[in-house]
Design a protein with these regions (language model features):
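Helix-loop-helix
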Residues: 1-62
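ABC-type nucleotide-binding domain
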Residues: 9, 74-77, 81-324
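Surface-exposed charge patches
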Residues: 18, 65, 198-201
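Extended non-transmembrane interhelical loops and adjacent amphipathic helices
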Residues: 58-69, 312
Length: 324
């Protein structure tokens, strides 16, 4: 309709100009016609825009319903039982998995983490470290082998109970457009305000929260863009402390933060990991040195396993990776 309107106005102006030169019409009549043409096409353009928006909305709704109607890739077994009162011992037994069935990402991975141990996952980008975490969280099911927690195959327990035992702190923390208090409370929705504040203190987040304009009632922007990355990670640690899981999954941030914030994050993580089984995708040397075990993963296989010092002494793949 915009093109039609433009052409009509152009024709009117040309024809009107020709008629005006011959004193058949006045300039005022021509201007009136141009205004009438604009008024005629304006609602038509509005209808066309509304139709385009409606088509976009229908396409979006179709995609949403496709997601809602899709069968979940991982479903609870009919006789699945809750996972409760666990110590936190984790074992991968000859696990093989690929996001595509003919392209394995992990092959024959075997590892054992005793309750309370810290396991650092080390390896080059794309080696399979994140896949180990995804399988432990049961975002996918293994193709061969099994994963157990305290001897129970995680495919035999309910997903809700499994994930309630897992605390996850990732590099990028998603914060909701809500108060700081409720963002931390997301770790355990039934927690009281006092419990939320206590978790924030343990996470070294209380000091900067109290400096905010409304303290714990300060509104957070979508995705937490009004907080620094270090502050977002401290809030994520507070969430995990509040949830009180037996098993932790940590993906250390690679981006730089100021020295004070990094020290606070490290102190909070040490408190969080105390007495819990922890799997850490490690980037910091301090974390690697403090880990009970290092699992060196390359091309989907655990190729070396041991402590930082023992693997350096072996002068294998980890030694070369560390020196590089």
């Amino acid at each position: 309709f915009t093109t039609m309107s433009t052409i009509t106005i152009a024709v009117t102006a040309l024809l009107g100009g020709w008629l005006a030169l011959r004193d058949i019409v006045t300039v005022g009549v021509i201007a009136t016609f141009v205004v009438y043409i604009n008024n005629f096409f304006r609602p038509l353009r509005g209808i066309a825009m509304l139709y385009n928006h409606l088509q976009s909305a229908l396409a979006g709704a179709e995609r949403i319903f496709e997601v809602l109607d899709a069968d979940p890739a991982v479903a609870d077994a009919g006789d699945a039982r809750p996972l409760v009162d666990i110590a936190g011992a984790v074992a991968f037994e000859d696990v093989t998995f690929g996001y595509e069935s003919d392209k394995p990402v992990l092959q024959d991975v075997t590892l054992t983490a005793a309750a309370g141990q810290t396991i650092a996952l080390v390896g080059p980008t794309g080696a399979g470290k994140t896949t180990v975490i995804n399988l432990l969280s049961r975002f996918y099911d293994v193709q061969d082998g099994r994963i157990t927690i305290d001897g129970q195959d995680i495919r035999t327990v309910t997903q809700d109970s499994l994930r309630s035992q897992l605390g996850i702190v990732l590099q990028d923390t998603f914060l909701f457009a809500d108060t700081v208090m409720d963002n931390i409370r997301y770790g355990r929705l039934a927690a009281t305000d006092d419990e939320v504040i206590a978790a924030a203190k343990m996470a070294n987040a209380d000091w900067f929260i109290r400096r905010l304009p409304q303290g714990y009632e300060t509104k957070v922007s979508e995705k937490g863009h009004n907080f620094s990355q270090g502050q977002r990670q401290l809030l994520a640690i507070a969430r995990a402390i509040l949830a009180d899981p037996r098993i932790l999954i940590l993906d250390e941030a690679t981006s730089s933060v100021d020295t004070r914030t990094e020290q606070q994050i490290q102190e909070a993580l040490l408190r969080l990991m105390d007495g819990r089984t922890a799997f850490v995708i490690a980037h910091r040397l301090s974390t690697i040195r403090q880990a009970d075990q290092l699992l060196v993963i390359d091309d989907g296989r655990v190729i070396e396993q041991g402590t930082h010092d023992s693997l350096l002494a072996a002068k294998g793949f980890y030694h070369d990776l560390y020196m590089s």
